[in-house]
Amino acid sequence: MPAALKCQRWTSSSSTTFFPVALNSPDAVEQALREIVAACDVTLLDLRVYPFEPIGVTGVAVVAESHVNIHTWPEYGYAAVDIFTCGGREDPSAAIPTLRECFAPERIETMEMTRGILLDEMVGVAAGDG
């Protein structure tokens, strides 16, 4: 069953000078994506990182099992991380220690979702069974 983990709303009080710098660093976002891919045991196909002006970074890792993306808003001490997998053996929550190590957030809020719940119904309709 496809799985997704969304991590949002990061703040940092103990490392206020480091944290926004990491969130605005294309190199830090790229390294985090590479480490997340390794931690989740997925197959990297492509990785792109885009810095924004005047501030912020978006990075996406396209993996054989789906994708991982990071969007940062350093001015708010905020990052949104989405990890989507569809292979079944992957564990998106394995990325949490990596995120803590790469960005040192004070708090990480997560939401786990299951995707593809309606797949059987949609396949049945597409095949003329519905």
Q: In which residue ranges do the predicted regions lie?
A:
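Polybasic/polar functional segments that serve as interface/processing modules
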Residues: 1-130
